[in-house]
Amino acid sequence: MTASNTKNASAIPIDKFSNVRITSIWTFLQSVDWSEPWLMALLAFHVFCFAFTLLSCKYYRIQICHFLLMVAMVYSAEYLNELAAMNWRSFSKFQYFDSKGMFISLVYSVPLLLNTVIIVAVWVWRTFSTMTELKILQLKRKAARENHKKTQ
């Protein structure tokens, strides 16, 4: 049984930069050098996007533009990954951009998609609130008509 565990453990990739055995998304993210300036800027960008998502909840048109912009950025992640893979030496210490796009998906696309999910949740909540208000208004009008008919 230990021989099979050793064989399975040897199949797990080891990160070349930190010599950490990559067994999960968490260990993958731990192997990243987060002190690089471009990663700090990316983190600041995601904090800004999240704050803008929360602050734009009351402004429907701004939120639509923000939503469409983030969806377009996620859509362009594959092209951005290819571009970054070709030019990583100009801005990074390590080559994080693999052909499958795992790094860019986790670090770039997932936070943007979480923001879009928040926006969609706000839209669904608004729709339900509007439908509830409309139904209450309809019931009040119906009751007022019935009361008006009874008094005549």
From Swiss-Prot:
Residues on the membrane's Nuclear side span 58-63, 124-152
Has UniProt tagged this entry with the keyword Membrane? Answer: yes
Cellular component terms (Gene Ontology): nuclear membrane
- Residue spans, topological domain Perinuclear space: 1-36, 85-102
| Keyword rRNA-binding on entry | no
| GO BP annotations listed | fat cell differentiation
Q: Where are the transmembrane segments?
A: 37-57, 64-84, 103-123
Supply the PANTHER family for this chain: TRANSMEMBRANE PROTEIN 18
The entry assigns this protein to a family as follows:
Belongs to the TMEM18 family.
Q: What is this protein called?
A: Transmembrane protein 18
